[in-house]
Amino acid sequence: MANLIRTDHQQHIPKKRKRGESRVFRLKTFGESGHPAEMNELSFRDNLAKLLEFGHFESSGLMGSWSFQLEIQRNPNPLYVLLFVVEEPIEASLNLRCNHCQYVGWGNQMICNKKYHFVIPSKETMAAFLKLEGGGYAFPEKESFSHLVELQGHVLHGFFHSNGFGHLLSLNGIETGSDLTGHQVMDLWDRLCTGLKARKIGLNDASHKKGMELRLLHGVAKGEPWFGRWGYRFGSGTYGVTQKIYEKALESVRNIPLCLLNHHLTSLNRETPILLSKYQSLSTEPLITLSDLFRFMLHLHSRLPRDNYMSNSRNQIISIDSTNCRWSQKRIQMAIKVVIESLKRVEYRWISRQEVRDAARNYIGDTGLLDFVLKSLGNQVVGNYLVRRSLNPVKKVLEYSLEDISNLLPSSNNELITLQNQNSMGKMATNGHNKITRGQVMKDMFYFYKHILMDYKGVLGPIGGILNQIGMASRAILDAKYFIKEYHYIRDTSAKTLHLDRGEELGIFCTIAWKCHHHNNEIKVPPQECIVVKKDATLSEVYGEAERVFRDIYWELRDVVVESVVGGQIEITRVDEMALNGNKGLVLEGNVGMMMNIEVTKCYEDDDKKKDKRIECECGATEEDGERMVCCDICEVWQHTRCVGVQHNEEVPRIFLCQSCDQHLIPLSFLP
């Protein structure tokens, strides 16, 4: 275990691996083909075995474990992290059934014999694991690797069942003190899933940043969660949210016109319209919808270097290139002053474009110049004023108003801003007075998130209309927590050939159909696996290899015996004859022994007891979704605590009556 803590001065190991010697692998390529293993097998279990050959073997016993040292950077200062792989047998699990599988949507999967945990500990979880003593790290006991997977707060923690289904449990980036960014950790996880040939991966998306839930922020901006960049899509929702509800909620929020939103917010909040105008002016493309706004802000935030600045147009001296404009700068500035004075005279009310134009024509006779200025002036800062322009959603006409923002601006010479716009807004030259930082963009993004997306919590008070609709849709988006990614490989043989030629061997895709006696002899068929046999193997040899593979993977098939081929192809006795027939996949018929059937039956009886629990919540949920529930003490129906008014930070009441039972109780007035 001395290799757990390594100094930065260790030399990189030679290409050839010596027995018992630790190796260093590049984080950036770890998991790709040949880095370190050629994971070119057709099954998850075989590729995993190849990968573990390159790991440093840490312990055996009940839970085997391996470690890999991954290099984050070599210069200027070498930086490493440790990746542990811990094998958890079914005997070490608290529950036979996997709750993660149930919540993400594949709870009917057969029970696997093993889980393989992939863990990159954080500094805190590593310290807890190694038990800091006297200023130095003590070597952990071999059996204590079970504690590693139980700790919370790892940089990365995901696990695979032995059939290739898996779950991502934890991912923490730089914000939590890690040396890795969230993107680096996620790239590594996705490479591992791809290289090992995982089947499906599920996750419970609780990712957040600066107080914002990323599945809502990225959902509105990009139409998918943060994990969508790696191919994760809706798996299942909580509180009765279905895929249709989720997609409808996303669509409704993303397509909200900013002009409509601005119109509603004008009378409620001064800051929001000003900020909207600020980012309209920063963008080279018009921001039409709420999706455009958040997408632009995310893009802008990613472009700005840390502690660096970008010019804000609020106090910019903007000019029009005289070669592209037929009016002089002097005439344009005069027209702007006239428009500003016209808006001042109506005491900052909203008036139509035509009214502004008519008032300005008393001083400016050139209607072409007025049209040009009005077109370019909308949502621009002029001196101490913000000229707001919005489409009236009722009258369907453009309206203008003036906002005094002198108290919001930093001290400056407050020069009159003229227009630089060939058609709408072109290149800008800054006087350097007002700068926008990466942190300011994040702060403004949180402001929009809080005051627009999350207003159902009453940030702006009890208001109705469009903001309430946005709040309800945002709640539905947040209640969609479980996302999945399905990895498609050649082993999914619904439309592919039976075998793959491997020289003297054949890779055969097959599965075993067996009767579950507890469920009225229901036929259960696990996903196909690739078994490798010689080209001239007999059917009995195929049966034997299939038994070995499926016994190793599934707890319910630990003593399965294959008896025949489904379909009754009795005349076929050799595998090469079967290959010549061009079958699409081999389905074998098997039986499970009596003792195993008793254990399986007991397991299913426990499942049935859980299924007998009546769940009838007002949100529409009819089964457990991982959220907290409470049971009525009279009708014994379970409901979400949130749906019955119990706040998240409140304890579940010891005695609880649902609304229906509470209304039907007869007052016992004769009791003292």
From Swiss-Prot:
Q: What domain of life is recorded for the organism?
A: Eukaryota
Give the InterPro entries listed for this entry. Answer: Zinc_finger_PHD-type_CS, Znf_FYVE_PHD, Znf_PHD, Znf_PHD-finger, Znf_RING/FYVE/PHD
Membrane-spanning segments: none
Q: Which Gene Ontology cellular component terms are annotated?
A: nucleus
**What is the organism of origin for this protein?**
Arabidopsis thaliana
What name has this protein been given in UniProt? PHD finger protein MALE STERILITY 1
Stated induction or repression of this protein's expression: Self down-regulation. Regulated by SDG2 via chromatin methylation. Seems inducible by brassinosteroids via BES1.
Q: Where in the cell is it found?
A: Nucleus
Q: Where are the zinc fingers (PHD-type)?
A: 614-664
**Where in the chain are disulfide-linked cysteines found?**
none
Q: Does the keyword GTP-binding apply?
A: no
Q: What biological processes does GO assign it?
A: anther wall tapetum morphogenesis; cellular response to brassinosteroid stimulus; microgametogenesis; pollen germination; pollen wall assembly; positive regulation of DNA-templated transcription; positive regulation of programmed cell death; reproductive process
Q: What does this protein do?
A: Transcriptional activator required for anther and post-meiotic pollen development and maturation. Seems to regulate inflorescence branching and floral development. May control tapetal development by directly regulating tapetal programmed cell death (PCD) and breakdown. Implicated in pollen cytosolic components and wall development (e.g. exine and intine formation).
* Taxonomy of the source species: Eukaryota, Viridiplantae, Streptophyta, Embryophyta, Tracheophyta
Could you list this entry's UniProt keywords, alphabetically sorted: Activator, Metal-binding, Nucleus, Transcription, Transcription regulation, Zinc, Zinc-finger
